[in-house]
Amino acid sequence: MQSNFIFATLLVLLSLLTFTYASGSSSMTSSSMPMFGGAIVAAFAFAIFSRLAQNFAPRAIFSLLPYHSVSC
């Protein structure tokens, strides 16, 4: 569980760093750089969302079911 927390924290920090890079690159002369930075931000946001969904979705689904319907 500790490694998942560290991994999620690193993903958040990297996404913030890429967001800063993407917002700062809009002043560059190349028109493809802001789009590239936005794609990086979207990829990191999707990675964070999928990691959170992978961790919390099974618990959330089984918590909605009645206890007697869950068989192990």
Curated annotation (Swiss-Prot):
Extracellular topology ranges: 23-28
Secretion signal, residue range per the UniProt entry: 1-22
Membrane topology recorded in Swiss-Prot or TrEMBL: Single-pass membrane protein
Subcellular location: Membrane
Transmembrane segments: 29-49
Keywords of the record: Membrane, Signal, Transmembrane, Transmembrane helix
Cytoplasmic side: 50-72
Gene Ontology CC terms, in alphabetical order: membrane
Transmembrane helix keyword on record: yes
Keyword Signal among record annotations: yes
Protein name from the UniProt record: Putative uncharacterized transmembrane protein DDB_G0287329
Provenance organism: Dictyostelium discoideum
